Amino acid sequence: MEEPTPEEEGGITIMSKSRKNPKTVVNIQSQKLDSDQNTPQFEKFTNPNPSSDTTSATNFEGLGLAEWAVETCKELGMRKPTPVQTHCVPKILAGRDVLGLAQTGSGKTAAFALPILHRLAEDPYGVFALVVTPTRELAFQLAEQFKALGSCLNLRCSVIVGGMDMLTQTMSLVSRPHIVITTPGRIKVLLENNPDVPPVFSRTKFLVLDEADRVLDVGFQDELRTIFQCLPKSRQTLLFSATMTSNLQALLEHSSNKAYFYEAYEGLKTVDTLTQQFIFEDKDAKELYLVHILSQMEDKGIRSAMIFVSTCRTCQRLSLMLDELEVENIAMHSLNSQSMRLSALSKFKSGKVPILLATDVASRGLDIPTVDLVINYDIPRDPRDYVHRVGRTARAGRGGLAVSIITETDVKLIHKIEEEVGKKMEPYNKKVITDSLEVTKVSKAKRVAMMKMLDNGFEDKVKDRRKLKRKTLADKGLLKKRGKRQKSTEN
């Protein structure tokens, strides 16, 4: 296959591979790439079993961090560095570009936040670091973690995401906060529409792509190009992700000689304390058995549950249906306002609401300490997404239950998931529901929910979102490439 050609500036490059256009390249670093080298110019450390890593530092002092940072870690209960922190923090402090691949919950955020704050304390100015993340919720969570780790620095941190007032955000950027955490779309708009914004990043020392596999998705190419054009060539680029993708693999193949790659790969594994079960039913009975599972929460000692669905429409419909059945719940999806999404997450995390319905916006990265039950109402098409979803429960050595409601069309997906995770799902101990009153009650609640969605304009929102998405894809020349995916997407 013909080798991809780096763009003019070279450096670490990301190739967005597709069957129709294998040479689409997104440049994410401005240092020169020596394309004549046959041997990849990077240092790589592969850690196949991070849980038994004997090279991990015994304390944070050993990573080269300042005393204040070490004390802050102790105050936050961080007694010993995780493997990804042990291997990546010293390299970042040494000025290296870093790609860190490690599982969810491995401490990736602190692995880049601590060395950034260490350097900021030595030479404080704004904007010192730009952190790009795929979702609004992750952006706010990252801001909380930066503020906690930099609590003694009088840190100024700004979150720039969609769904919030752009004038206020522009003023926040012009005030030059130390750390800017953003989603790709909103920062692109501000950079292009206000000439006062690009100079803010003229001295930025660090660029971080968190959940890099998702940020580097082909749909974000234009946003990334706009971002990179305003950043200085002397910056450090840090990428952290839970999974390897073709874009990140291309990074390994086309990297600058300064890059360090840490990979903690244990395959797509689920923890031993997680019980994985399934219910096999007709498509028309999915709502009925969802309600059946939820009705058993109290008897099973389950305090909190997350229900994952594939679309915003399904998320809203199920939430309204459960409301009608007087099952306390809250929904989080991208058609909700930002304040509603943050409120939903806060209420669920605090235990005020026991059930959270969500699209995959909540499957990765979000710090939700205790979830007893995960329900896959819709089966994800990628086994990695399944692992991220069920990884919301059975954390930190605790037990957890994951139940997947599958239909005839999901069987191949389930077999693929079982093959990838190396574990068979067990049948859920369900009763056969024959009570006509129960069936009628759920059916009526479903109809009421659908009528409410028509009456309150939610269906119009879905149609408008679909039109906007198709227009965006068409403007980027991606509509034909992603046509099949578009048909199955109701966002």
Swiss-Prot record:
Q: Where is the signal peptide, in residue numbers?
A: none
The species is: Arabidopsis thaliana (Mouse-ear cress)
- The Acidic residues compositionally biased stretches are 1-10
> What reaction(s) does this enzyme catalyze?
ATP + H2O = ADP + phosphate + H(+)
Report the GO terms under cellular component: nucleus; pollen tube
Does Acyltransferase count among this protein's keywords? no
> CDD domains of this UniProt entry?
DEADc_DDX49, SF2_C_DEAD
EC number annotated for this UniProt entry:
3.6.4.13
SUPFAM superfamilies the UniProt entry points to: P-loop containing nucleoside triphosphate hydrolases
Q: Where is the Helicase C-terminal domain?
A: 289-438
> Where does the record place the region Disordered?
1-56, 471-491
Motif Q motif covers 58-86
| Basic residues: compositionally biased ranges | 479-491
Q: What is this protein called?
A: DEAD-box ATP-dependent RNA helicase 36
The UniProt GO MF terms for this protein read: ATP binding; ATP hydrolysis activity; nucleic acid binding; RNA helicase activity
* Pfam families registered for this protein in UniProt: DEAD, Helicase_C
Write down the superkingdom of origin. Eukaryota
**Family under the similarity heading:** Belongs to the DEAD box helicase family. DDX49/DBP8 subfamily.
Q: What is known of its domains?
A: The Q motif is unique to and characteristic of the DEAD box family of RNA helicases and controls ATP binding and hydrolysis.
User: Polar residues: which segments have biased composition?
Assistant: 24-56
UniProt feature coiled coil, ranges: none
Enumerate the UniProt keywords alphabetically: ATP-binding, Helicase, Hydrolase, Nucleotide-binding
* Lineage, top ranks: Eukaryota, Viridiplantae, Streptophyta, Embryophyta, Tracheophyta
